[in-house]
Amino acid sequence: MINIRKTHPLMKIVNNAFIDLPAPSNISSWWNFGSLLGICLIIQILTGLFLAMHYTADTTTAFSSVTHICRDVNYGWLIRYLHANGASMFFICLFLHVGRGLYYGSYLFMETWNIGVLLLFAVMATAFMGYVLPWGQMSFWGATVITNLLSAIPYIGSDLVQWIWGGFSVDKATLTRFFAFHFILPFIIAALAGVHLLFLHETGSNNPTGLQSDADKIPFHPYYTIKDILGVLLLILVLLSLVLFSPDLLGDPDNYTPANPLNTPPHIKPEWYFLFAYAILRSIPNKLGGVLALVLSILILIAAPLLHTAKQRSMMFRPFSQCLFWILVADLLTLTWIGGQPVEHPFIIIGQLASILYFTLILVIMPITSLLENNLLKW
């Protein structure tokens, strides 16, 4: 009798995606982050669901309801900090996943890559709205500053901002709609992740060499299921270490002060995972220019396949491109640091130079270097 796993309509889909899936025999631990992102999403949806049972999306009670979760709900503190630090783990995995894609040329799977960029935007939107919900000082002022950026859009800008706010300032209407969107978006992300996977399985996975791997495939289970479980255990270890030893390490102390529209915090800054984009935004003195640079800093990923001038797919055998890639990583870390600093000398000029380098590397230096490598290899 044939195995039910291969015949049952539902189990067949799972089987073809996670069990009998032919995978390249040489994919490294950099290929673990897809499954880790799936685990992060599940953790966020589950913890978020339990938080939503006790949270109230009202300006007068939102802050107190979060305090109530931490003090009075059984293991509420654990659920809350798992959710907050789970977001940080989510972004660490996201950045590593995208970095892997750039390094090994995975962006040449166009559909998978474009859905991935869309997913990145969706996760960033979700995280931003989630940060507003505790209604602390940084929640309120972060929401005010970031939504206000839309007023830079010519002609419709100010109307658009008021439409998003649901009034003339960030208030009850804003908080309620942000909660509604924050609740629904993770499910949209889950659906998009399914489409992401669907497109990936049309082509099969890339591998570190960037060469065709059809001649040497192995079944996903047990080889990569075991490998993924190791990754998951390490992820959970890091997450629990954060949650149980220093849950507020990545947060902002200002968010333990209830939101007050009459008192602006000295340094308004977003969560650490947005700091690189925030630094790029601040490095341009013009409002519209800053907003465009902010959006383009992530939207530029869409252009990755168009900027691929190398004859080889992966950077594995391209040492010059490798050097530039790691310079880009260092540049992003510099931008992240600058985003958390006050707007004063020498941080302004460092931020501006790092922003220029970011765009120049991606748009000019890396494509030209790839062409140079083609010539050096006589391709």
Swiss-Prot record:
**What does the entry comment about cofactor binding?**
Binds 2 heme b groups non-covalently.
Which protein, by its recorded name, is this?
A: Cytochrome b
Stated role: Component of the ubiquinol-cytochrome c reductase complex (complex III or cytochrome b-c1 complex) that is part of the mitochondrial respiratory chain. The b-c1 complex mediates electron transfer from ubiquinol to cytochrome c. Contributes to the generation of a proton gradient across the mitochondrial membrane that is then used for ATP synthesis.
Q: Which SUPFAM superfamilies has this protein been placed in? A: a domain/subunit of cytochrome bc1 complex (Ubiquinol-cytochrome c reductase) (SSF81648), Transmembrane di-heme cytochromes (SSF81342)
Q: Where does heme b b566 bind?
A: H97, H196
Q: Where does a ubiquinone bind?
A: H201
Q: Which residues cross the membrane?
A: 33-53, 77-98, 113-133, 178-198, 226-246, 288-308, 320-340, 347-367
> Could you say which residues bind heme b b562 here?
H83, H182
> Subunit notes for this chain?
The cytochrome bc1 complex contains 11 subunits: 3 respiratory subunits (MT-CYB, CYC1 and UQCRFS1), 2 core proteins (UQCRC1 and UQCRC2) and 6 low-molecular weight proteins (UQCRH/QCR6, UQCRB/QCR7, UQCRQ/QCR8, UQCR10/QCR9, UQCR11/QCR10 and a cleavage product of UQCRFS1). This cytochrome bc1 complex then forms a dimer.
